[in-house]
Amino acid sequence: MSDESYESRIIDGKVLAQQVEEEVRSGVEDLESNRGIVPGLATILVGDDPASKMYVRLKHRACERVGIKAEDYLLPGDATQEELLTLIDSLNKNKDVHAILLQLPLPKHFSPQETQEAMEAISPTKDADGFHPYNMGKLMIGDEDLVPCTPHGVIRALEEYGVSVQGKNAVIVGHSNVVGKPMAAMLLNRNATVSVCHIFTDDLKKYTLGADIIVVATGVKHLIKADMVKEGTVIFDAGITKEEDGVYGDVDFENVIKKASLVTPVPGGVGPMTIAMLMKHVLLCAEKSL
């Protein structure tokens, strides 16, 4: 098969993101015309980490495209936990702010416990990222409301591409709270048989070879190789590794695409969908505030 023939196997996250953004734009216009409300997203950025600043810019551009009012709240790199919590409290009380996003990671002087405390301080009804334990708990019992954006984007892509999940073997590689755990829950909610693998899993290949659907998010360049997947597998690559010569995913895309029925590229796959689902969540937060 020629390289051109493989193009039909690529899940185009940019096209899907445009579809979601169009839906959000329509919803934003309806909310403004019928209720006089413009959805507002507050983004908290502590310090001046270049990668974090870049991600915030990407999110703001998406807000501009769909008509969401986005505002940055910047704290210096040496900000204290008390200062951060005070800011979050004020945003929780601000009726013009419908959704709050705390850009991670926080500077190194914030302990993991402090980061978690800050995430939990955000009102569950303004939790744009879907990370609050209340929203995670709802997800675990099958009540999907505000869920983490990357898994939400994967589910939307599965639906758009007509991939049946029920009864399928799904393997999640990586068990973070951001992708792995919520992804497993969302697939379980759709009656997939789910295995979650991680750094301590023996013989990862044994699991991936039996998978109909693979979602990988480890940050390990080309962890998933062609000999680790069976013909016809659907693969979502939510990992990213930046090197001097380019950006790479967790999947050896050039070789895996020859066996997969569908696969996301890096970049241009899961990333755009994640940001689009964030926009959808901001609109949802605004609608729930009525």
Curated annotation (Swiss-Prot):
Q: Which sites bind NADP(+)?
A: G174, H175, S176, I199, I240
Give the pathway: One-carbon metabolism; tetrahydrofolate interconversion
GO MF entry, a single one? methylenetetrahydrofolate dehydrogenase (NADP+) activity
Does the keyword section mention ATP-binding? no
Q: Which domain of life is it from?
A: Archaea
Entry keyword annotation includes Oxidoreductase = yes
EC number(s) of the enzyme?
1.5.1.5, 3.5.4.9
Reaction(s) catalyzed by this protein? (6R)-5,10-methylene-5,6,7,8-tetrahydrofolate + NADP(+) = (6R)-5,10-methenyltetrahydrofolate + NADPH; (6R)-5,10-methenyltetrahydrofolate + H2O = (6R)-10-formyltetrahydrofolate + H(+)
A single GO CC term, please? cytosol
Keywords, A to Z, come to: Amino-acid biosynthesis, Histidine biosynthesis, Hydrolase, Methionine biosynthesis, Multifunctional enzyme, NADP, One-carbon metabolism, Oxidoreductase, Purine biosynthesis
* InterPro entries for this protein: Aminoacid_DH-like_N_sf, NAD(P)-bd_dom_sf, THF_DH/CycHdrlase, THF_DH/CycHdrlase_cat_dom, THF_DH/CycHdrlase_CS, THF_DH/CycHdrlase_NAD-bd_dom
Which Pfam families does the entry link to?
A: THF_DHG_CYH (PF00763), THF_DHG_CYH_C (PF02882)
The GO biological-process annotations, alphabetized, read as: L-histidine biosynthetic process; methionine biosynthetic process; purine nucleotide biosynthetic process; tetrahydrofolate interconversion
Subunit organization: Homodimer.
UniProt xrefs under PANTHER family: C-1-TETRAHYDROFOLATE SYNTHASE, CYTOPLASMIC, C-1-TETRAHYDROFOLATE SYNTHASE, CYTOPLASMIC-RELATED
Give the family from UniProt.
Belongs to the tetrahydrofolate dehydrogenase/cyclohydrolase family.
Q: What is the annotated role of this protein in its UniProt record?
A: Catalyzes the oxidation of 5,10-methylenetetrahydrofolate to 5,10-methenyltetrahydrofolate and then the hydrolysis of 5,10-methenyltetrahydrofolate to 10-formyltetrahydrofolate.
Q: What is this protein called?
A: Bifunctional protein FolD
The source organism is Methanosarcina acetivorans (strain ATCC 35395 / DSM 2834 / JCM 12185 / C2A)
